Design a protein with these regions (language model features):
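Solvent-exposed, amphipathic alpha-helical segments
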Residues: 17, 21-29, 75, 79, ...
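Alpha-helical DNA-contacting segments of helix-turn-helix folds
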Residues: 54, 62-68
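Key DNA-contact positions within bacterial/archaeal DNA-binding proteins
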Residues: 48
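Hydrophobic/aromatic-rich alpha-helical bundle segments in the mid-to-C-terminal region
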Residues: 128-132, 136, 150-202
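Hydrophobic alpha-helical connector segments
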Residues: 63, 76-111, 161-168, 192
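Amphipathic alpha-helical segments used for helix-helix packing
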Residues: 92, 105-129, 177
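Basic, helix-initiating cap at the start of DNA-binding domains
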Residues: 1-29, 33-45, 58-62
Length: 204
């Protein structure tokens, strides 16, 4: 008789599956409409498995938000950098602005979800450290992306990378929220123009 050995999934794999499921639930239901039980069911684990990896729903949201940001925003910046480094008739800032607009402003709900979570944080001071850590991590990722960008395209002499990353971060978030709420008031050409102005202040 053959005995089948059940392989226990790695903790990192379980965590990744939970974060992916959480991202899908939050995107569909919003922050208030999502529960830990729903995330667990979607991931195919028990609630206990979720709580062994995360303290609760706020921490789940922060992890899912960070996964979105790393993929969509930092990834979009990498794509934009690639576009700028490729042969083109467009000036570098315009090429990057076009790529950023295409990748970032796709109607994703996450910037709006972050606003929903921020409203919860305003009412629950205990969550402020979690929110601050999330935003600081995002800024650090953009600083690192800008530092890598400087190896491929020239940056303005004396540029403060943290200030530039914060400006870019604020621009991406604000434009995404406005575009999501009223696309007709924030047309693509205007978005590209705004990104171009910001990037011209960053690039040499």
């Amino acid at each position: 008789m053959t005995t089948t050995t059940r392989v226990r999934p790695l903790r990192s794999d379980v965590r990744e599956q939970i974060v992916t499921a959480a991202g899908a639930e939050f995107a569909e239901r919003g922050y208030a409409g999502t529960s830990v039980a729903q995330v667990a069911a979607r991931a195919g684990f028990t609630k206990g498995a979720v709580y062994s990896n995360f303290e609760g729903k706020p921490e789940l949201f922060a992890a899912a938000m960070q996964a979105y940001f790393a993929g969509a925003v930092v990834g979009a910046f990498a794509d934009a950098l690639g576009a700028a480094a490729s042969p083109s008739d467009q000036p570098t800032a315009q090429a990057m602005a076009h790529a950023l607009a295409e990748n970032v402003l796709l109607g994703e709900r996450w910037p709006t979800l972050l606003g929903e979570f921020r409203a919860v944080v305003a009412q629950e001071p205990a969550l402020r450290d979690l929110y601050a850590e999330l935003r600081l991590t995002q800024r650090t990722q953009l600083v690192d992306a800008l530092r890598r960008a400087g190896e491929q395209v020239p940056l303005r002499v004396g540029l403060d990378l943290e200030v530039a990353a914060t400006l870019l971060h604020t621009c991406v978030h604000g434009l995404s929220v406005e575009r999501s709420a009223a696309p007709e008031a924030m047309p693509t050409a205007l978005v590209e123009g705004l990104f171009t102005q910001v990037l011209e202040g960053i690039l040499a």
